[in-house]
């Protein structure tokens, strides 16, 4: 932990997905002295590394910030727990491990909104490929297509970010693929080509049956570099600023707290905020960068009046549970002593079986309505069921079909509650507060029922256990969505990047805070609009892009 040396070229705040990649890339230049600050502990907790260990990391203060939302009007007054990774690797150490880029149109839209073509799909694809290590290119020829020419145009090999296929399959999920195909959702073997429409098994960020986090991929291999320093359990209290003779405001460092001791750290080049979509806006607001009205209400001196904390977007998921017959599900296995023993032994000796599972094994991307111009729904399908996350599985065979709106129009916010850095901010996603989001929720529930009613599923005699077929009208389904919908932990957008003249954008297209020198934000908070899928790998792409700009002096 801190010694007498508190001057560095680059200070990275947050040792999560983006921070780990940035630390790797910036320290690759020997002249750069890089400090990575992480509020959580080292990622030595054993459950981090076992895929099913997310069950013991989410909701655990050892690895989770333990946030909760405010009561949500769109969720009929319910509050949601809001997990965020608090350890090296950040959310990549506790998430669902699904490798998902989103759609090419997401990045074309970012380029349009920012006025900068370096955010388009072509440039984003190059950044994804730069750190990708895809199993389908391990032996040269792609085992699925028989060649690697077209696949290698879209994917990389030899990078740090390992992508593997899942290590087990389930008959009931294979049948769901067929049922979706009967509905017109085509099968796909690659959700990451730029058009993720289709149905198939997710690829995952694992290596040989272990979770492959950003810490393992990007940080551990380079921690011995003499120009890279990593401090854990280091809480950033505020950013520090000074005004030059020309009147320009510069961020010259940070004040951190470590075990009750305040330490000032100086950044000779840049401070890079990579604390995530909740903590990055909180740190900015506490430091005087944010909406003037909010800051003044807490007695904070305004450095820059800018909409930090606004534009919060998230994916909200509606979960349906179906009882099934005549097939094996995880419920069946875990409700017997023999089954549990088999699961443990299978992982111990083969690194396979249910302990190697991601939370969701199968996915589908499709339209909620034929009039939609592109896929706006993502399905997460599981051979298991439970009442709520963290509870025991049901004692009957069942499957869960969850579906989320990929392009919500509801917008929320993150706002500090006090001037204390240890006080959790107010998190208000404002779920289901637009007519369009409620319409998508209704359509998605009806679509789930149609898929489960296809011939391929009839052999399992599926019975809708939750929410129940008694809910049929638009009004009933809207109210139902408010009762049962839950976040799938993809908050983004709270420190928006955009065109230099956009008053709603906090950052310029190269992620520099407008109105301040020496300060950049690089994490999921910069997204002007949420990507059409899981958000962890897009966050790494953002960091890859930013690292290139920083190293080239842009």
Where are the regions a protein language model picked out?
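N-terminal redox-cofactor-binding region of secreted/periplasmic oxidoreductases
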Residues: 1-554
């Amino acid at each position: 932990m801190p010694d007498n040396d508190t001057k560095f070229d680059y200070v990275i705040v947050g040792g999560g997905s983006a921070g780990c990649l940035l630390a790797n890339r910036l320290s690759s230049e020997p002249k750069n002295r890089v400090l990575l600050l992480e509020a959580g502990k080292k990622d030595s907790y054993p459950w981090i590394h076992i895929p099913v260990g997310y069950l013991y990391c989410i909701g655990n203060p050892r690895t989770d910030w333990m946030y909760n939302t405010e009561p949500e009007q769109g969720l009929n007054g319910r509050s949601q727990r809001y997990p965020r990774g608090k350890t090296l690797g950040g959310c990549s150490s506790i998430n669902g491990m699904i490798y998902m880029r989103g759609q090419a149109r997401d990045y074309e839209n970012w380029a349009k909104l920012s006025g900068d073509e370096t955010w388009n799909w072509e440039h984003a694809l190059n950044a994804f490929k730069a750190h990708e290590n895809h199993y389908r290119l391990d032996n040269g020829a792609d085992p699925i297509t028989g060649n690697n020419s077209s696949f290698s145009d879209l994917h990389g090999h030899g990078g740090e970010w390992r992508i593997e296929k899942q290590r087990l399959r389930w008959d009931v999920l294979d049948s769901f693929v067929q049922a979706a195909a009967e509905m017109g959702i085509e099968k796909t073997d690659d959700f990451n080509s730029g058009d993720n429409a289709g149905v198939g098994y997710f690829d995952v960020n694992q290596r040989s049956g272990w979770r492959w986090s950003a810490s393992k991929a990007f940080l551990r291999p380079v921690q011995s570099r003499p120009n890279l320093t990593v401090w854990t359990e280091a809480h950033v209290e505020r950013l520090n600023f000074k005004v030059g003779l020309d009147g320009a405001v510069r961020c010259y460092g940070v004040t951190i707290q470590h075990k009750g001791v305040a330490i000032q750290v100086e950044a000779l080049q840049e401070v890079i905020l990579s604390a995530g979509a909740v903590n990055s806006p909180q740190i900015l607001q506490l430091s005087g960068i944010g909406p003037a009205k909010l800051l003044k209400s807490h007695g904070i001196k305004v450095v820059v009046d800018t909409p930090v904390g606004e534009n919060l977007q998230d994916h909200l998921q509606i979960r349906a549970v179906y009882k099934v017959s005549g097939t094996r599900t995880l419920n069946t296995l875990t409700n017997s002593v023999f089954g549990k023993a088999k699961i443990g032994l299978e992982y111990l000796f083969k690194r396979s079986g249910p302990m190697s599972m991601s939370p969701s094994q199968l996915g589908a991307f499709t339209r909620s309505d034929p009039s939609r111009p592109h896929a706006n729904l993502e399905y997460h399908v599981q051979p298991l069921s439970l009442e709520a996350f963290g509870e025991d599985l049901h004692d009957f065979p069942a499957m869960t079909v969850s579906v989320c709106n990929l392009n919500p129009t509801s917008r929320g916010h993150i706002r500090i509650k006090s001037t204390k850095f240890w006080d959790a901010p107010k998190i208000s996603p404002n779920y289901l507060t637009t007519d369009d989001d409620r319409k998508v929720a209704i359509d998605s529930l009806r679509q789930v029922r149609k898929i489960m009613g296809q011939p391929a599923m009839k052999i399992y005699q599926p019975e809708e256990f939750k929410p129940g077929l008694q809910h049929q009208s638009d009004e009933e389904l809207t109210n139902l969505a408010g009762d049962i919908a839950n976040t799938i932990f993809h908050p983004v957008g709270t420190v928006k990047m955009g065109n230099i003249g956009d008053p709603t954008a906090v950052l310029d297209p190269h992620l520099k805070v407008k109105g301040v020198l020496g300060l950049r934000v690089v994490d999921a908070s910069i997204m002007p609009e949420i990507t059409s899928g899981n958000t962890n790998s897009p966050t790494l792409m953002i960091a890859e892009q930013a690292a290139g700009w920083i190293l080239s002096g842009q």
